[in-house]
Amino acid sequence: MTKALYLDCHAGIAGDMLLSALVDLGAHPEDIESELKKLPLDQFKLHFQKRVKQGIHAMTLNIDVKESNHHRHVNDIFKMIDDSTLPERVKYRSKKIFEIIGQAEAKIHGMSFEEVHFHEVGAMDSIIDIIGGCIALEQLGINTLYCSAIPTGHGKIHIAHGIYPIPAPATAEILKGIPIAHFDVQSELTTPTGAAFAKGLVSSFGPFPSATIQHIGYGAGSKDFNFPNILRVIQFDSEFEQQDSVQVIECQIDDMTPEALGDFMNNALEQGALDAYYTPIFMKKSRPSTQLTLICKLHDKIYFEQLILQETSSLGVRSTSVNRKILNRAFKILSTQHGTVSIKFGLQNGKIMKMKPEYEDLKKMAKTTNQPFQVIHNEVLQQLYQTYRIGDILQ
């Protein structure tokens, strides 16, 4: 059994809404503030209070801060987190969210990741939202997060670089591959920080899974509308495998180069395909050929069928809806002599069925220590199997 959290983003998601909802769920604001004040930040005070939003009693957050208004680089924020005494999983989750926002800003502004100035993100309130939210998740013992489709709103927004359409450029970049919900509201409903929380920490998107609800928290946004501007978070104990349906799209291709096939696969995965792979086959006239198989969410069926017809030489596709069963997933941080690595667990009835270190973490660790990847991989696996055992209940 593992603690899981569902983010019901019917009115969007922002960092302050999530932190407020987690406090309403049961996280202790005094402990969150105490942990945050261990960081080298300007003086601040958190004020959580209840407000009524269109009949819904929800928690809100106001931050009193004396800010020096200096911009922070991503490495400044990473160093601040690394040098802190925060729990390892809080460090990992926080850095992952900042990295997602930084990568989006770097791409939009045409600069390297290290050159990114964190304007809004570097501001005190955003640092508090991100790190405070990860502290609250740790307090509540949340291992796995799920999320609904996310509405963005529409219209125009004033940001540091001028007037931009909604979703803001960084938000749109972050939300690539994430299902978007239509909500006809002329306002920004989802911020880059909220989008990065979902992108970085959520295991899967869709309707609420079959489960027994344990607790519910409500976090209110700062704007008032004719609907409840709230984020609802639902805590439940995840005991059984997930079951859902996905779309399998296939076609045969015998006249594309390997380079073109590779480019299409990369593009499809970037656009949100769950998986894509090629199988060598023989077609009529004994021609060596390739079968493309693409797996996506049901609601993405039309989009990926069109993508295949536009970007491959195929004249048609076959599409089938299939059921799938998935082990519950949970993540924990493993501390090693070379640094920390995220471990992905596959669980059934709370028992460990599968476990593996995240490849990207191992790759970074090998690069940082200047050691062969296989050496790092073997050392981490050895420590992993000394710490956890297949069949044990994940604590």
Swiss-Prot record:
- UniProt-recorded Gene Ontology molecular function terms: lyase activity; nickel cation binding
Which reaction equation describes what this protein catalyses?
A: Ni(II)-pyridinium-3,5-bisthiocarboxylate mononucleotide = pyridinium-3,5-bisthiocarboxylate mononucleotide + Ni(2+)
EC number(s) reported in the record: 4.99.1.12
Keyword vocabulary terms for this entry: Lyase, Nickel
Identify the Pfam families for this entry: Ni_insertion
Q: Which InterPro entries match?
A: Ni_insertion
- What is the enzyme's class at the highest EC level? lyase
GO BP terms: namely: protein maturation
The transmembrane segments are none
Q: What does this protein do?
A: Involved in the biosynthesis of a nickel-pincer cofactor ((SCS)Ni(II) pincer complex). Binds Ni(2+), and functions in nickel delivery to pyridinium-3,5-bisthiocarboxylic acid mononucleotide (P2TMN), to form the mature cofactor. Is thus probably required for the activation of nickel-pincer cofactor-dependent enzymes.
UniProt similarity note: Belongs to the LarC family.
Query: Which protein, by its recorded name, is this?
Result: Pyridinium-3,5-bisthiocarboxylic acid mononucleotide nickel insertion protein
Which species is this record about? Answer: Staphylococcus epidermidis (strain ATCC 35984 / DSM 28319 / BCRC 17069 / CCUG 31568 / BM 3577 / RP62A)
Give the organism's phylogenetic lineage.
Bacteria, Bacillati, Bacillota, Bacilli, Bacillales
Which gene is the coding source of this polypeptide chain?
Answer: larC
